[in-house]
């Protein structure tokens, strides 16, 4: 493996930072990680999938992989629309990726209006095209396509709006992501070398095999480390998100080194950082547990995050998006927050740099609800129980596409200050609700609520509800309330 002087010096700097601590590249040392307070309090963030794959805008963000798999819809669409893959390959979308209407300030203002507190633009997806200025490859948005440091512009705009800038790297999967292009006449063929867009295009493994061959090489892993540390140093993100292939055995030493480097940089900056990971890629307690398009069925004693998309069928913009409703997204947010989690909601901008009108409308609807009910979400903590009600929920990844059919008996709880927030997931037409977890009990040995409620209100309404408590629960009458969204009852405790 040949490295230039910049790369050699950078690796030496990485080693120096890791050696200096306070974090070192062992799980024992990384276990000293503590979730940053800002993340625990923020609760709601925005994810952004925007890149070359936004140009074809067909099916989903895996277009660059699937356009090279014979028989796939993307393969057939590509040949019908652009020509054969040897004449028009994925790289040929770069001149069409102009981002001519991209305004980072407009995006950041929209996210602020949506009630988000932090934003994760994707720095590099599986396709290998960097959305930032890089010294490690020419295949980036600064030198090609829009000729802009889109990630840098977003960082400035996001922070100017008072939001927290984070970012994600999906580079690990690039090891194999474009490999099917070698199976027929296309523009992906040897020789390939480090720095090329299509390098290394190795055979795609079974994703469940964490020791798959061909084993990622030292050259590839070094490149992954350098790219990640470049993002860390150039953009100083408050948190990093990694997608799924970093759980492969080959990544472990490099992953630990990167984590130590990043956490040490955070210590130098005077603001702790965090890594979001899936599939036990990292040792539990050394970062933030992530669940893609799903959640836990029960409250967790640790800080975690669910990442999902505004559309059910894609993370990037396409012309066939199947959108979730604002109600469905708000139900997910409330349920996740009650279980000690955060929700990271993805939107996919168009290749011209605009965010679709439907996305904007949904985000503003969410923001309107949060403007009224945010005290039950932001900086809240789980109550002694997260929920009551009859509806059973699915848990795990890829389980959130269908809206859960909640009833007026399904309630979620959060707490903050002297208040318990009872969030009714489906408000009944007659305005009558019973919160059974706030019943009166004569047996103080039972581990239930035994406090005194001095006042009850409905967030967003000036009129006070009628209420009383007995052994069956807290009975609320609020016929003046009408909403398709979750309704928050605020119970102030003596």
Give a label for each model feature.
Residues 2-494:
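Mature catalytic domains of secreted/periplasmic carbohydrate-active enzymes
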